[in-house]
């Protein structure tokens, strides 16, 4: 989330303190890598916006899947390696047998975007000149085709330059799309539309590792944030749908517990529990059961107000007009 300069120092100090455990001090790179599971690494970017976005890199024999791409805005611009692609191709990792994740870019990239916000798409330009293809929701592909990406991504609000993207290297996929490699071999990754945080949001199910990549649908330790097109009612319905889906998977005999890998701050959590708790928290905010902690001017809506709510590990920064819409909605807010 971009903030007003007057608030920057307090917000920066708070964010640095809350996320210090995610970042290793380095004289080489703005990324910190840890192994998430047998096939996947989590990269955390030390960015100047203090978003600390999480990028996931899943390794296959035929390709490298990258889920989100971070900000491409290093907090320390003097570091030798601040490009996501360069990190993946050149920085050796102890947890990867002292090899880079994709040495010299030998394998093609399949890039999956959870949604359009600047802290998830900023690293896309680093992949130009390499073999890559981008997969996103159909809604996001429409946003790009209609020349709304600079606005809807918040890059305009954050005074960031427009991204230059090759539309021929992008595919907007339907809900439930199964990803395959260049030889039409299933990668056991399913892409699901998941609106709420933003209208173009999607999540990724890794059926091999029983991991759900949630983007900004749910996480702990930092406020869930809503900007253009956010919808609390849709968000609750999305969380309920995902909770039901994963619960169904887990009821199969011998099935593993699903793990959540989030876009910020949280990974390795019990996915069903996180979805349940987030859904209940948002519903309780709408119903007035969680008091507003503070209010400030909404940087994305003239005359609007952002309200802040917290409970236990969860928090929310929500425009007041979205709360009014949800409280006045005739749609059932909780389907379970």
UniProtKB/Swiss-Prot annotation:
Pathway the protein acts in: Secondary metabolite biosynthesis
Presence of keyword Nucleus: yes
Protein name: Putative transcription factor avaE
GO MF annotations, alphabetized: DNA binding
Gene Ontology CC terms, in alphabetical order: nucleus
Cited InterPro entries: Metallo-B-lactamas, NDM-1-like, RibonucZ/Hydroxyglut_hydro
Function: Putative transcription factor; part of the cluster that mediates the biosynthesis of a highly modified cyclo-arginine-tryptophan dipeptide (cRW).
């Amino acid at each position: 989330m971009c903030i007003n300069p007057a608030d920057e120092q307090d917000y920066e100090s708070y964010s640095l303190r809350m996320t210090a455990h995610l970042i290793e001090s380095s004289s080489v790179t703005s990324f910190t890598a840890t192994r998430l599971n047998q096939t996947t690494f989590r990269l955390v970017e030390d960015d100047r916006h203090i978003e600390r976005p999480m990028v996931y890199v899943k390794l296959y024999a035929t390709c490298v899947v990258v889920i989100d791409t971070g900000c491409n805005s290093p907090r320390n611009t003097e570091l030798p390696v601040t490009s996501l692609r360069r990190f993946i191709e050149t920085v050796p990792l102890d947890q990867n047998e002292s090899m880079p994740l994709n040495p010299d870019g030998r394998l093609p990239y399949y890039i999956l975007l959870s949604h359009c916000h600047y802290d998830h798409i900023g690293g896309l330009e680093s992949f130009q000149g390499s073999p890559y293809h981008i997969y996103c929701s159909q809604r996001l592909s429409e946003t790009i085709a209609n020349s709304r990406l600079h606005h809807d991504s918040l890059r305009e609000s954050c005074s960031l330059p427009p991204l230059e993207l090759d539309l021929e290297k992008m595919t907007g996929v339907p809900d439930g799309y199964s990803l395959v490699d260049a030889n039409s071999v299933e990668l056991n990754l399913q892409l699901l539309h998941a609106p709420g945080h933003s209208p173009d949001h999607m999540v990724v199910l890794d059926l091999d590792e029983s991991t759900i990549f949630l983007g900004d649908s749910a996480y702990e330790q930092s406020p869930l944030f809503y900007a253009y097109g956010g919808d609390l009612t849709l968000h609750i319905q999305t969380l309920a749908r995902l909770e039901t889906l994963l619960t169904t998977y887990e009821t199969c005999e011998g099935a593993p517990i699903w793990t959540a890998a989030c876009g910020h701050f949280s990974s390795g959590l019990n996915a069903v529990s996180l979805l349940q708790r987030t859904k209940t928290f948002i519903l309780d905010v709408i119903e007035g059961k969680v008091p507003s902690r503070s209010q400030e001017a909404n940087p994305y809506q003239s005359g609007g107000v952002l309200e802040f709510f917290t409970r236990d590990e969860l928090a929310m920064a929500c425009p007041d007009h979205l709360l009014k819409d949800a409280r006045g909605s005739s749609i059932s807010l909780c389907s379970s």
